[in-house]
């Protein structure tokens, strides 16, 4: 597969769920996002898309309660691990159902079933089924999920971390991270000073403030730093963080009409 034909697209957890209400999906938002994607793919049949989505209010509450991200060892930890897995899977099932209704040929690839990490770094992950899904002109879907870890028992991998690993093998030309915020802001939460471009080599600690939402995988700063690292290791890949809260926003981004923050 040629890189120019592949886009990684993330639907942020804060976009597709109400992160202030436990396990509450925004079905109306999902529907117009998936409608935008369907229109784009119908108009651009040569393009391949890999989707990732966050867990939002489905995974982050349980993950924060048990601190699953930091490791799993006790019986209570493992019960928490399973609870996070259940919540993440529940949202993924909703996503797959809505995508199928939108006539998008999606297939889910839960990281917990195929990825083993060691010290929160990918040790093994058989991505051949994902590659073959793309070659068959189907749409693979990954999502933030628990994984077993050889050093710390278990942990959580965010969608951005999954994208980072997949990019080394699939080489997307573009990565779109759709969320609520219109850009990365240097004055959060006032949100008056958007950053239109962030260099892959630029330090983030001086201009990115903490997220307003509970996010066990690190929030905006972690997201930006992960994507900067991805850009450094995959020259030519362009990343955009943007808002898709309104119908048509995603379609514009897919068509290259930039409105958010570009990382390159």
What are the functions of these language-model segments?
Residues 11-14, 52-56, 242-245:
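Glycine-rich beta-strand-to-loop/alpha-helix junction loops that act as flexible
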Residues 8-12, 50-53, 109-110, 141-143, ...:
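Short beta-strand segments
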Residues 129-161, 202-211:
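Catalytic-site beta-strand/loop segments enriched in glycine and acidic/polar residues
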Residues 25-28, 123-128, 155-163, 221:
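Charged helix-capping and loop-helix junction motifs
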Residues 1-50:
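N-terminal glycine-/serine-/threonine-rich phosphate-binding loop
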Residues 79, 83-96, 153, 161, ...:
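Polyanion-binding loop/helix "lid" in catalytic or ligand-binding cores
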Residues 169-194, 241, 246-247:
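Acidic, metal-binding active-site segment of PIN/NYN-like and related structure-specific nucleases
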Residues 65-146:
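Ligand-binding beta-strand-loop-alpha-helix segment within the catalytic cores
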């Amino acid at each position: 597969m040629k890189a120019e034909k592949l886009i990684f697209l993330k639907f942020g957890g804060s976009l597709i769920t109400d992160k202030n209400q436990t396990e509450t999906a925004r079905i109306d938002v999902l529907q117009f996002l998936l409608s935008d994607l369907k229109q784009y793919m119908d108009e651009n049949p040569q393009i391949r898309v890999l989707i990732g989505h966050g867990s939002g209010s489905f995974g982050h509450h349980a993950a924060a309660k048990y601190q699953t991200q930091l490791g799993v060892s006790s019986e209570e930890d493992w019960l928490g691990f399973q609870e996070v897995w259940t919540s993440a899977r529940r949202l993924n099932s909703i996503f797959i159902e809505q995508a199928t209704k939108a006539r998008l040929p999606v297939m889910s690839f839960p990281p917990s079933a195929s990825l083993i990490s060691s010290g929160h770094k990918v040790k093994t992950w058989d991505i051949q089924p994902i590659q073959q899904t793309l070659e068959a002109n189907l749409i693979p879907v990954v999502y933030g999920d628990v994984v077993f870890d050889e050093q710390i028992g278990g942990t959580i991998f965010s969608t951005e971390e999954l994208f980072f690993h997949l990019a080394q093998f699939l080489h997307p030309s573009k990565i779109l991270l759709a969320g609520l915020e219109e850009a990365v802001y240097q004055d959060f939460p006032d949100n008056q000073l958007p950053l239109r471009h962030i260099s892959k080599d630029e330090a983030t600690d001086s201009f990115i403030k903490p997220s307003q939402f509970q996010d066990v995988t690190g929030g905006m700063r972690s997201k930006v730093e992960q994507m900067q690292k991805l850009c450094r290791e995959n020259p030519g890949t362009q990343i955009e963080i943007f808002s898709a809260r309104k119908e048509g926003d995603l379609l514009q981004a897919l068509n290259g009409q930039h409105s958010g923050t570009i990382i390159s």
